[in-house]
């Protein structure tokens, strides 16, 4: 940790189509080997499909899906007197977004549909309806935190 002042996180440019910083971050999470234009086309195709399916604005549907995947608590390992406890801690807002995006992308990559755009659209569609692998991941994390609530006093 720096002794003098905290480092401000870098500002990322909003995405060109919707002007959303959240969507630009999501594109960066999806991007592989620096191929941003490919990641953008995948995300935009997925959002078009999602908008047609849900009859909502693409950005609204995306934010709704992300909201359903964001975790509020997680567990962190804490070593106390020779034994390791899983201590539930609240998740910072920036990490909340990052985890939600990462889980959506991981779940989409594991799906068996034809194109990545279709997989992503299906995962976002499922997430907006509170089902799918990404939502299940969030529920698992919340369940772990709930099960280890007794160790909450070990927070640091």
Curated annotation (Swiss-Prot):
Coiled coil, from the record: none
An MF annotation (GO) of this entry: tRNA binding
Superkingdom, natural source: Bacteria
Record GO biological process: translation
SUPFAM superfamilies noted in UniProt: Ribosomal protein S7
Pfam families cross-referenced by the UniProt entry: Ribosomal_S7
Keyword RNA-binding on entry: yes
Annotated Gene Ontology cellular component terms: small ribosomal subunit
Xref: CDD domains: uS7_Bacteria (cd14869)
Gene3D superfamilies xref list: Ribosomal protein S7 domain
Keywords on record: Ribonucleoprotein, Ribosomal protein, RNA-binding, rRNA-binding, tRNA-binding
Subunit structure: Part of the 30S ribosomal subunit. Contacts proteins S9 and S11.
Family to which this protein belongs: Belongs to the universal ribosomal protein uS7 family.
Stated role: One of the primary rRNA binding proteins, it binds directly to 16S rRNA where it nucleates assembly of the head domain of the 30S subunit. Is located at the subunit interface close to the decoding center, probably blocks exit of the E-site tRNA.
Record PANTHER family: RIBOSOMAL PROTEIN S7 (PTHR11205)
The protein's name in its UniProt record: Small ribosomal subunit protein uS7
Organism field: Mannheimia succiniciproducens (strain KCTC 0769BP / MBEL55E)
Lineage of source species: Bacteria, Pseudomonadati, Pseudomonadota, Gammaproteobacteria, Pasteurellales
Gene: rpsG
């Amino acid at each position: 940790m720096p002794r003098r002042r905290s480092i401000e996180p870098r500002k990322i440019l909003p995405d060109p189509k919707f002007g959303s910083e959240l969507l630009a971050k999501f594109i960066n999470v999806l991007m592989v080997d620096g191929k941003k234009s490919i990641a953008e086309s995948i995300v935009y195709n997925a959002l078009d499909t999602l908008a047609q399916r849900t009859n909502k604005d693409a950005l609204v549907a995306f934010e709704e899906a992300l909201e359903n995947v964001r975790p509020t608590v997680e567990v962190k390992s804490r070593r106390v007197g020779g034994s390791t406890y899983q201590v539930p801690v609240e998740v910072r807002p920036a990490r909340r977004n990052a985890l939600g995006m990462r889980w959506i992308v991981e779940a989409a990559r594991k799906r068996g549909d034809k194109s990545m755009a279709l997989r992503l659209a299906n995962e976002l569609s499922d997430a907006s309806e509170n089902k799918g692998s990404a939502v299940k991941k969030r529920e698992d994390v919340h369940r772990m935190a709930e099960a280890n609530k007794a160790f909450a006093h070990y927070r640091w």
